[in-house]
């Protein structure tokens, strides 16, 4: 089946090689290692994977990248609700770096030098409980 908006076969899209983040992460660690509080590769745990690595904070993701047509097709064909989709799939967000906001522009520039789009997708706030909020084009989801 074709992903119409991309004019490519869905199977080829799913099986296309995944980018390795090793070179860009190595470059980021050269200058920012001591500023990084955490890193999460969102494959194998989706957008909720961060919950395995935090305690008593509220992770808020409210500036997500636009959703890829592939994930829209998967959701439509499977009938999976969007909350579950964000739990299972990375939704196009593959790597997260948790660090103070004042260093984000440096890291974004490094990513861009490797031709990788990057941006601040959210923030972490103090909380009495571990919590994740995803505010996306597909809805507001609490985990």
Show the residue positions of the predicted features:
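Glycine-/charge-enriched secondary-structure boundary and capping motifs
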Residues: 4-15, 19-143
